[in-house]
Amino acid sequence: MMKAWNFILLGLMVCSGIFAQPAENQIVITTNHPLVKIEKDIYGHFSEHLGRCIYDGIWVGEDSRIPNTRGIRNDIVKALKDIGIPNLRWPGGCFAETYHWKDGIGPKESRPAIVNTFWGGVTEDNSFGTHEFMDLVEMLGCDAFICGNLGSGTVQEMAEWVEYLTSDAKSPMTDLRKKNGRDEPWKVKYFGLGNENWACGGNMDPDFYYDQIKRYQTFTNLHGRNKIVNVACGPAGDDYNWTEVMMKPHGPRPYLPFDALGLHYYTFIQSVAVDNDEWGWFSTFRDNYN
């Protein structure tokens, strides 16, 4: 008898499921009351002297048969404008920690060459420098993110670069900028206080790096009306100790010597920076899409 009642109960449940009417649901979307704002600058891009990103990639020179504007490839400008990049970072990356900006200004035929020690050991002629990069940024209508050389450079070198870029006062650096063809200062939104200083930027520990950026930051905000966002080097992956040290004010003055922290996370492949073979390309795609 119990089995019969169980069968009847099961039948009633099945029938009720068949004849039940679906409930009407409504979704209300209020477009004028956003909950959060996604900062556009997290979608910024990076241009480093790595492989053919700069030479042959962005820069081909004024005499190239590839269509260009003042040496910068027109197709690259169009592609980057089409995706609407908010900011562009240059010259690195690890390359920034060997780059001395004064070698990349003035007449191109007078610029000294540089050996790209981090990426392939190739020799570059420095024909793409500060003026060329800022020209590119203005073509794109995006913000400039300059990365300074904290690893092998000096405080004075970095401070003079900021002055050259942004100052409107009468000074040796602004006179030099005008001599090189740019009367008005540029607008620079972001300035990196080194790059990956736990590795290629000097193999520093976080306490030492923190002390270094206190000196550098002191002298990079002194010029013109351009308020620069100083970006410090963040951790390698999940190195929480680096972050803890960076976010804790040191010494008698309780302030952080930076405005933002750069984060670094990579998918590594066993390949080379230039002249990648077919396997290198497929490995890159596979590791980044998995």
Question: What does each model-identified segment do?
Answer:
Residues 3-10:
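Sec-dependent signal peptide recognition
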Residues 15-17:
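N-terminal signal peptide c-region/cleavage motif recognized by signal peptidases
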Residues 20-244, 248-260, 286-290:
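Non-catalytic accessory regions flanking glycosidase/transglycosidase catalytic cores in CAZymes
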Residues 256-268, 274-289:
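Extended catalytic-interface subdomain
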